[in-house]
Amino acid sequence: MTGGAGVNARAGLKTRMLGGDPPDTFQVHAGMELIGTWVVANRMEDLSALFRQEGWLQAFPKGLIDLISYKGGIWSVPVNIHRSNVMWYLPAKLKEWGVNPPRTWDEFLATCQTLKQKGLEAPLALGENWTQQHLWESVALAVLGPDDWNNLWNGKLKFTDPKAVRAWEVFGRVLDCANKDAAGLSWQQAVDRVVQGKAAFNVMGDWAAGYMTTTLKLKPGTDFAWAPSPGTQGVFMMLSDSFGLPKGAKNRQNAINWLRLVGSKEGQDTFN
């Protein structure tokens, strides 16, 4: 099902899961996107035995195992690790405009004003709702730092804390540099604006490189380039696509065979 970040797929999945017609497996972001929905609803099978059989407890990073674990069970098989906090740009266009990739959000805001003065109406390309949430994550990570970013989600830092409020304030100023028609654009169309020279920057995960390289036939490092999103140098904000096994899958054994494949070295190398 089309739709960035699985927005449409999740709606279709909900209909099938609640209607007693679960798919044999489905793609889901590792962590609470699955655990906080279908795992706590007792709709998924525990894959711990499969992980032991395949030796994956030793193969996957411990932090990733922790992310897909809940109440003694392991609930999905990761197939990749993405970096989300990446800023994309075209070196030739930045040279033409006389600016550099900003290293902080303050630098970004100053660069934004410079570019607006040069006639670039919206220096930051932005797409539909989930891409705006994606951007907020990178802004908040920069403002809070890794420790307080984690504290925001484990309950040690409240969203009403002045540090958290400042993240929203910075985010608001960053949005002033973005296109006003963001809600109508896919993430690919937002990337296109950078490629077409209609915007200078786009904050998107490393899958944007796949789009520009494979679909747009651009050469990485030459035609397009990247940097950590402002203020996040040395920090790798990760996310992982994974597959789980719903209870009641009609082709359960085939689904398990699929999970074995995507979790294998051969499967991981092919997928990535």
Question: Where are the predicted features?
Answer:
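Extracytoplasmic/periplasmic solute-binding protein
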Residues: 70-79, 85, 109-157, 199
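Short, solvent-exposed loop/beta-turn-alpha elements that line the ligand-binding surface or hinge
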Residues: 46-60, 143-166, 214-220, 224-236
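Extracytoplasmic/periplasmic substrate-binding proteins
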Residues: 33-37, 135, 169-257
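Conserved N-terminal structural module of periplasmic/extracytoplasmic solute-binding proteins
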Residues: 1-41, 49-58, 72, 101, ...
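Glycine-centered hinge/linker elements that transmit conformational signals in sensory
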Residues: 112-115, 153-184
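Short helix-initiation/N-cap motifs at beta->coil->alpha
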Residues: 2-12, 103-110, 181-196
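Periplasmic-binding protein-like
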Residues: 119, 261-272
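Hinge/lid segment of periplasmic solute-binding proteins
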Residues: 31-85, 100, 109, 135, ...
